[in-house]
């Protein structure tokens, strides 16, 4: 296992906006992130929170253009280029949207993918190394991380079955081979070990209602514990 600088890990902290929260969802294809994000959004709005749902890459005009260019490309992108493209989109999302919106009290931002996807995709699956990814992000605003990350974990077999059931066209990353997707799981598992206080691992193979209740409990623990 790659040795990660512990002092570097300590540089990654959530933004400080009393009464507002930044939450991310992670997982491989077929984990059901989108379904759970939508349900959690409805739940939080019922609790009178102002909820914004963002995605990575994306969330800004610049980020959405990068997303389209990356996911629709028919040529291989160099791993270093991938890494910096995602970091670029993330920096813009943070400055243009996240930090401004969190300044409004009672706001919750939910982001579909964030830093841990870069750790999994470029750090592990593309073999750039996690240390390099973290060093790239050790600068404002990229060192800012969510208050809580929900990692909806499924195995490769479950992912492939669910993708087959959806029968959707595959994008740049979805079309990679099985070994790539197994490395993604390894990458997310490693991220969970590196940031255990931030990342909550939820078993995504269960019934969607059971998964939802587990996630809701994690969200409640974050929000209402912090309010106390």
Where are these regions (language model features)?
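NTP-dependent small-molecule kinase module
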Residues: 1-16, 41, 157-228
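Pre-Walker A (Motif I) flank of P-loop NTPase domains
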Residues: 18-22
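Hydrophobic anchor at the beta1->P-loop junction of P-loop NTPases
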Residues: 25
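Walker A (P-loop) phosphate-binding loop of P-loop NTPases
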Residues: 30
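Conserved lysine of the Walker
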Residues: 33
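Hydrophobic positions on the alpha1 helix immediately C-terminal to the Walker A/P-loop
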Residues: 36
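ATP-dependent small-molecule kinase phosphotransfer cores
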Residues: 47-141
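A glycine- and Lys/Arg-enriched "phosphate-lid" helix/loop adjacent to the NTP-binding pocket
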Residues: 118-186
């Amino acid at each position: 296992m790659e040795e990660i600088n512990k002092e570097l890990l300590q540089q990654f902290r959530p933004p400080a906006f009393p009464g507002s929260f930044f939450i991310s969802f992670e997982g491989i294809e077929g984990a059901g992130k989108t379904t759970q994000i939508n349900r959690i959004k409805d739940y939080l709005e019922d609790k009178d929170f102002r909820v914004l749902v963002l995605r990575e890459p994306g969330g800004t005009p610049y980020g959405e253009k990068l997303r389209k260019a990356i996911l629709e490309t028919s040529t291989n992108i160099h791993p270093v280029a991938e890494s910096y493209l995602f970091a670029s989109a993330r920096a813009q999302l943070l400055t243009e949207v996240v930090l401004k919106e969190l300044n409004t009290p009672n706001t919750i931002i939910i982001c579909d993918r964030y830093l841990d996807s870069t750790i999994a995709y470029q750090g592990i699956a593309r073999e750039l190394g996690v240390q390099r990814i973290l060093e790239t992000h050790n600068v404002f605003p990229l060192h800012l991380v969510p208050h809580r990350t929900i990692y909806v974990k499924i195995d490769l077999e479950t992912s492939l079955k669910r993708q087959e059931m959806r029968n959707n066209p595959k994008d740049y990353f979805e079309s990679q081979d099985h070994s790539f997707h197994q490395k993604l799981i390894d990458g997310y598992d490693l991220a969970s070990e590196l940031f255990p206080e931030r990342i909550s691992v939820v078993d995504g193979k269960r019934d969607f209602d059971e998964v939802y209740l587990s996630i809701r409990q994690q969200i409640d623990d974050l929000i209402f514990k912090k309010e106390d």
